[in-house]
Amino acid sequence: YYEDVEGNGMIAKMLQKFYEAGEDSRKTTGTILQIAFLTFRYQQLKKAVMQENAVLDSSLESDFVMAYQLHQNGEIDDVDFNIYVTLSQEMQANVNGSPWNGLPDLAVYLQIDPDHEIDEIQHRGREMEDIRDKPELVSYYNRVNQAYREWSKGYTRSTLLTVNRDKYDFVNHPEDRNAVLDQIEQKLVDLGKLSPQRFAEIQQQRAVTE
C-alpha cells in the first residue's frame, strides 16, 4: 500500500495549497490536509489488516508525527489538534480487533541526513516542494526530519528497524535494495514472522532476477 500523492487528486490539490505560501499556508491548510492524509491511511489500513503479509509505506502513527510537529510550531492550533488526536485514536481503535491487529509486526524507519533528504526531495521533482523557489522550506524540512528522529527514539508500539538511508541507495542500486530487504526479512525471522526456509527461498528468488 503506497502513498500515491499524484494519483489522489484531492490530496494533491491540498498539498499545493499547503506549500504555496510557507508558514501562512501551513496554518490555513495544515489541519484539513492532515485529516485528509489520516482518512486515506485509515482506508488503506482497514484493507491491510484483513490480509496476511501486508506492507504499508506509512501509518497512522507516522501521520501523527506530521500533525504533532505542525502543532508544536503553531501551525495547527490546540482545538484542531485535539480533534485530530481524537480522530486518530478512534481510527486506530477501530482496527485493533481485526484479524492481524492494527499494529505492524515490524516498523521500518528510514533515517536520513537532513541535507541528503533535501537533495532527494529536489530530485523527486515536485515543483511545490522546490527550495529554489521557496528557500524557507529548508527549515521546514529540517524540522520534519528532526521530528521523526525524536519519534524513533520513543517508539514502543512494535519492533522498530532503523535503516541508514545515507548508506543505501535502494532506489537506484539493486544490491543496496537487496541488502535492505535482507535486513527487514532477517528481523521478521527473528520475530518468528518468517521462517528461515522461506527467507532463504526469497533471497534465492531475488538473486535469480538480478
What residues fall within each predicted segment?
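Conserved substrate/cofactor phosphate-moiety recognition/catalytic segment
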Residues: 1-34, 39-40, 67-69
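Short, solvent-exposed polar/charged micro-motifs at secondary-structure junctions
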Residues: 9-14, 108, 170-175
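A basic- and aromatic-enriched beta-loop-alpha substructure that forms the phosphate/nucleotide-
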Residues: 33, 38-79
